[in-house]
Amino acid sequence: MMPALSRQARNALGFFAILATVGLFLPDYRLLVVNQHLFLALNVLALNFCLGLGGQISLAQGGMAGIGAYASVLAHAHFPQASVLVVPAVVLAAFAFAAAISRPMERLGEGFLAMATLGVSLIFTNVVLTMGDVTGGSAGLMVDSRLNLPGLGALSGDRTFFFLFLMVMACGCWTFAALKDSRPGRALLACKDDPLAASSCGIDRAALRSLSFGLGGALSALAGVLHAHYGGFINPEQFSLELSLKALLFLVIGGPGNVLRPLVAVLVLETLMSGMQFLGEARTLAHGLLLTAALLAGYWRSSRPRRRPPGSAVRVAEARKPM
């Protein structure tokens, strides 16, 4: 007999089954909006690797998504048929870059870490504006190349990219859950719960946080790659600080460390806010009230008494077990 699926696995299967059904039957012009929500959801999931596992508040998701987008577009301009090589190279480079900058930023301490990651997004924007001859500057850059996959050819269309976004999200959720249940994941949670106790037990906090930050940066870069080739046009405003702040907001609403709730929060709340166009100028107030209510609901949920999972001491002990 096959082992019974856990509750989390059943919830994940139901969530992605519902999204797949939506993608099959929703009209193309509706999918255009949904795909923008999925792009934001991928960045929320990327931030969850940093904050939900490593306890690192990051405002670099917009910059990392922009790095992935511009790197892929510029590389495809020279190698238009090499998507199979270009996309993995961009993602791996983003992982290496994020993991590398995490090390020195870790030494700044918790209070300055968010400010340091904010600098990544600001530096990205300044570099794009300065190198206008290559990046198009503030005017943006038209994306003439398309993603090409062997046997499928050039990928285009709202529905095709919907399922690409969905597939990347499913892989990201699986990676997050697998890492969380692994020994490095338990060590990361121990560092998050009690950094001093984890360090005193010999856990390399900086190396583990480099891993979580690198994975978050790589996922944001991949989201940027899909966003660039789907929309056909990129400019710095698409990857501004607003994207990083929205990712942080929705992650706080859904709960850092939970893999599905932040994604549901993005899709539900963004859909509701998109449907408030009829309110005219009052929609800004309505958006604020809706997000405030969602934040209060998230706070109420997190403050309810509940059975606590094993504490940091147990996680540290499990993380120290020999491989």
What are these language model-derived features?
Residues 155-235:
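Helix-loop-helix "hairpin" substructures at the membrane interface of multi-pass membrane proteins
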Residues 23-77, 103-113, 190, 195-199, ...:
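Single transmembrane alpha-helix segments in multi-pass membrane proteins
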Residues 1-42, 71, 80-86, 157-159, ...:
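Membrane-interfacial amphipathic/re-entrant helices at transmembrane-helix boundaries
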Residues 40, 66-70, 91-95, 119-123, ...:
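Residue-level recognition of pore/gate-forming positions within transmembrane alpha-helices
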Residues 79-122, 264-266:
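Alpha-helical transmembrane segments within multi-pass membrane transporters and channels
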Residues 120-154, 185, 302-308:
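Extracellular/periplasmic helix-loop junction at the C-terminal end of a transmembrane helix
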Residues 62, 87, 209-296, 307:
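Transmembrane alpha-helical segments in multi-pass inner-membrane proteins
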